[in-house]
């Protein structure tokens, strides 16, 4: 399984912040540290990775991405075996404007009741130290790679 995503960053007074997504739905409702993610989504066969990353950012954040030159951050492998390819883009969005696509699932389990939930229930800006705590552990390397790239430029 493969996903592609965009790590949006901004600089406020010389300090870098990154935008992360919290997954929606009842399974994730009470999880915080280690539960957040880069806005990303699954890649179908023969899809362009960067195009998928841009599409998924729009679907999960609800705001089209305008980024002329995304910075490649490489890939990371999650515990599940899923490979996540990521790019960084500089930009700014207001988390209050976030609108996500939705998914349906039976909830509560074995109830026969199907409910709809947002794929992402919120997005927030984080300083790198906080982002490392919030992110799925495998994705923390993406923040480190971004900071390395920004130091080099």
Where are these regions (language model features)?
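N-terminal strand-loop-strand
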Residues: 1-37, 87
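Short, charged/polar surface micro-motifs in flexible loops or helix N-caps
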Residues: 12-15, 25-28, 44-45, 80-82, ...
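Residues that scaffold the ATP/ADP-binding catalytic core of kinase and kinase-like folds
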Residues: 30, 46, 134
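Functional cleft and adjacent loop/helix regions within the main domain
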Residues: 35-39, 45, 89, 151
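The catalytic Nudix box helix
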Residues: 38-73, 127
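Active-site-adjacent beta-strand/loop module that shapes the phosphate/pyrophosphate-binding cleft
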Residues: 75-112, 124, 146
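Non-DNA-binding regulatory cores of transcription-related proteins
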Residues: 115-121
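Charged phosphate-binding loop/patch that engages nucleotide di/tri-phosphates or the phosphate backbone
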Residues: 124, 128-153
């Amino acid at each position: 399984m493969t996903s592609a995503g965009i790590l949006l960053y901004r600089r406020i007074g010389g300090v870098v912040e990154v935008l992360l997504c919290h997954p929606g739905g009842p399974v994730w409702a009470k999880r915080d540290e280690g539960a957040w993610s880069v806005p990303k989504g699954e890649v179908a066969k023969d899809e362009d990775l960067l195009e998928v990353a841009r599409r998924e950012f729009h679907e999960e954040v609800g705001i089209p991405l305008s980024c002329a030159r995304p910075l490649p951050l490489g890939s990371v492998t999650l515990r599940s075996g899923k490979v996540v390819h990521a790019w960084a883009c500089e930009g700014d969005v207001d988390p209050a404007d976030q609108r996500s696509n939705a998914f349906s699932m039976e909830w509560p389990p074995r109830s026969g009741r199907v409910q709809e939930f947002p794929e992402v229930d919120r997005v927030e800006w984080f300083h790198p130290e906080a982002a490392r705590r919030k992110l799925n552990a495998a994705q923390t390397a993406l923040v480190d790679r971004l900071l390395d790239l920004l130091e080099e430029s």
